[in-house]
A protein has these predicted regions:
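Cleavable N-terminal export/targeting peptides
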Residues: 1-30
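Short glycine/proline- and aromatic-enriched beta-strand/turn motifs that initiate or cap beta-hairpins
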Residues: 20-80
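Residues that define the transmembrane beta-barrel architecture of outer-membrane proteins
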Residues: 27, 47-53, 84-90, 127-135, ...
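Residues on the lipid-exposed face of transmembrane beta-strands in outer-membrane beta-barrel proteins
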Residues: 33-35, 55-61, 92-96, 135-141, ...
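Transmembrane beta-strands of outer-membrane beta-barrel pores
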Residues: 35-41, 61-63, 70-76, 98, ...
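Flexible, solvent-exposed loop segments that connect beta-strands
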Residues: 39-47, 74-85, 116-130, 159-169, ...
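Repeated loop/turn-to-beta-strand initiation elements of outer-membrane beta-barrel proteins
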Residues: 63-68, 101-108, 145-151, 180, ...
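Predominantly the C-terminal beta-signal and adjacent terminal strand-loop region
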Residues: 192-260
Length: 260
């Protein structure tokens, strides 16, 4: 597997928000842009890093939320002024909140994403155009005054040019667990996370993988400010992304600590 050692620098982030309010039509909008650079070691291409520009637009009205985004990613040799294999990723998501109160909340998201790959110096590959369809329910349930059960489940279907891009045709991703509130300042959330790529077509073996983690968050609220230390503990992780050269699954072990 290719090994990445990212050192991420946010070099540009711009955003603006506006609201248009009418008596029966209350729309809220925000729009922004970001340019992200990652230093990459051992990527397999003689490049300095990854370039990841993106722009986004969000709109909300009552129970509806609409999100549009455009993202691009690919390795770049900045000194030579050239890039390696890269892709475009326009995306649309629509979320509807069916129910929302202190006892129970339930919403549903539908989405579409297109991957436009542009291969550079890869024999037998020129371009690929792959689509991903998404449906994702989310929930929040009050068990007691201090204990809640919440989470989300995303189900994806990939189509077109999968043998070129190396993706599996189906994927599920979920994070769900319990949150206990000790007081107005401290709360603890412990979740189970799973992401699994697999093929519904038994004749296919490309792009299969599995990641299982325990994710713990310590939510600290200090007046108008909040900070959340977190950790991710790997339970099981393997992948089959090198399926064209080696169909054996490769194991991994990644843990993480962080702050946001």
């Amino acid at each position: 597997m290719k090994k990445l050692l990212p050192c991420t620098a946010l070099v540009m982030c711009a955003g603006m928000a506006c609201a248009q309010a009418e008596e029966k039509n209350d729309w809220h909008f925000n729009i922004g842009a970001m340019y992200e650079i990652e230093n990459v070691e051992g990527y397999g291409e003689d490049m300095d890093g990854l370039a990841e520009p993106s722009v986004y637009f969000n709109a909300a009205n009552g129970p509806w939320r609409i999100a549009l985004a455009y993202y691009q990613e690919g390795p770049v040799d900045y000194s030579a002024g050239k890039r390696g294999t890269w892709f475009d990723r326009p995306e649309l998501e629509v979320h509807y909140q069916f129910l929302e109160n202190d006892d129970f909340s339930f919403g549903l998201t539908g989405g579409f994403r297109n991957y436009g790959y542009h291969y550079v110096d890869e024999p037998g590959k020129d371009t690929a155009n792959m689509q991903r369809w998404k449906i994702a329910p989310d929930w929040d349930v009050k068990l007691t005054d201090d204990l809640r059960f919440n989470g989300w489940l995303s189900m994806y279907k990939f189509a077109n040019d999968l043998n070129t891009t190396g993706y599996a045709d189906t994927r599920v991703e979920t994070e769900t667990g319990l949150q206990y509130t000790f007081n107005e300042t401290v709360a603890l959330r412990v979740n189970y996370y799973l992401e699994r790529g697999f093929n519904m077509d038994d004749s296919r073996n490309n792009g299969e993988f599995s990641t299982q983690e325990i994710r713990a968050y310590l939510l600290l609220t200090l007046g108008n400010h909040s900070v959340t230390p977190y950790t991710r503990i790997g339970l099981d992780r393997w992948s089959n992304w090198d399926w064209q050269d080696d169909i054996e699954r490769e194991g991994h072990d990644f843990n993480r600590v962080g702050l946001f």
